[in-house]
């Protein structure tokens, strides 16, 4: 989708370097951009806003995930400068601040798979609670849950 939107702007070589995958968390998009395309980050951000109609903000991930809270540095490249959004997954709603806590929508299938393994009466310890996604998904069952 992104490569198609930029086909008249980027050269074929630049298009090949473009990372076509991005994370969409509510109305926020987080995109990785190779160093060779940093000078075109605003154009890439604008193209994403135009392609993803519910998106209001596009951030460039300018650092890898790091630190105790596994956060990443984000730089606004298009849209509104807000890092908090509502995210929906498996009939649950979450308010997530993508700048303050690690969150990956790519793990939704894994969170659902693991939560389906939990049986009533079990004790579950979630050692890496983050924003609480896994814990809230499993809280629908009758068990003891500790989130750290």
Predicted regions: what they are:
Residues 1-148:
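SAM-dependent transferase fold signal centered on methyltransferase-like domains
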């Amino acid at each position: 989708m992104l490569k198609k939107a930029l086909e008249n702007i980027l050269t074929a070589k630049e298009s090949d370097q473009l990372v076509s995958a991005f994370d969409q968390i509510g109305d926020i998009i987080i995109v990785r951009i190779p160093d060779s395309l940093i000078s075109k980050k605003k154009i890439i951000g604008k193209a994403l806003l135009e392609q993803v109609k519910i998106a209001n903000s596009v951030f460039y991930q300018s650092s890898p995930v790091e630190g105790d809270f596994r956060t990443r540095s984000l730089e606004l490249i298009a849209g509104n400068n807000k890092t908090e959004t509502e995210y929906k997954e498996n009939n649950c709603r979450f308010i997530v601040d993508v700048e303050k806590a690690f969150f990956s929508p790519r793990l939704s299938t894994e969170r659902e798979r693991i939560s389906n393994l939990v049986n009533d009466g079990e004790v579950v310890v979630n050692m890496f609670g983050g924003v609480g996604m896994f814990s809230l998904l499993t809280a629908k069952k009758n068990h003891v849950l500790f989130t750290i």
